[in-house]
Amino acid sequence: MPTQRIISAVIGIALAFSLLILGGWYFSAAIALVIYLGLREYFQMVRAKGIAPAAKTTMVLSLMLLLSATVTPHLTDAFFPLTGALICFYLLFQPKMATIADISTSLLGLFYGGYLPSYWVRLRLGDGAVNPMGLHLPLNGFWPESWAHPENFPTGLLVTILAFACIWAADIGAYIMGKWLGRTRLSDISPKKTVEGSLWGVGGSLLVGVLGAWYLQWPYWEITGALLGLLIGIVSLLGDLTESMMKRDAGVKDSGQLIPGHGGILDRTDSYVFTAPLVYYFVVLLLPVLNNL
């Protein structure tokens, strides 16, 4: 792995982990920056196809969805169709009549680049309970008083760390084992991905999921942890392939050049987009049911 790529990865993980721990508006601001930069790259690819989306309007409304996820998370799902309607209304009154492609790419940008990432904020927020075992900073920030007792960290933080760890395990496992053992191409969409590497990546995510469920004392932790790890491994891979499909259609190798050795923001966050709602509803809907059995 090139030195530049390693340095970028280490810096990125350190920043992401620090902001993840801080939570509150610090984490929301970080996600807002990712949404803004990611949508810029997305709309550059869209324009490369000769399409004229409502880029600025979609960016603003995507950030408003994130604001809702931070302040009123229970209303974010209700705001989503309203913001979609506003995009349609905006395009309706433009001097040049909008095409189906203009409308659909704008709505996809809202969904892919704004609504889905907002689930990371909701997941990190957790149940919103105040945890006394840490320093409570301005802007709803949190910092542990002691690193020796992570069991006292906010539940939302622990679950989000677990989700990140599963994604990292899947990415690292697929990259290393794919380089070593990869023989069978997985898909023409992403020629460098192999079946062998992907299976090892999913296996790494599954293992981390089981360990995390055991640590968090989830009900039936062997099953719930394996299921979550398996789903994250698969969905993060599908997220990667989805972004690769968009890049191939736009005729570009990378979504951008922002991160040395890695490409653009979308190239680094594609595995996270679909994972956030998966983990959120797994924790919010499935675990409470199992707790009552």
UniProtKB/Swiss-Prot annotation:
Keywords: Cell membrane, Lipid biosynthesis, Lipid metabolism, Membrane, Nucleotidyltransferase, Phospholipid biosynthesis, Phospholipid metabolism, Transferase, Transmembrane, Transmembrane helix. It comes from the Bacteria. Its EC number is 2.7.7.41. It is found in: Cell membrane. GO terms for molecular function: phosphatidate cytidylyltransferase activity. The keyword Membrane applies. It is a multi-pass membrane protein. Belongs to the CDS family. This is Phosphatidate cytidylyltransferase. It comes from Synechocystis sp. (strain ATCC 27184 / PCC 6803 / Kazusa). The lineage of its organism: Bacteria, Bacillati, Cyanobacteriota, Cyanophyceae, Synechococcales. The gene is cdsA.
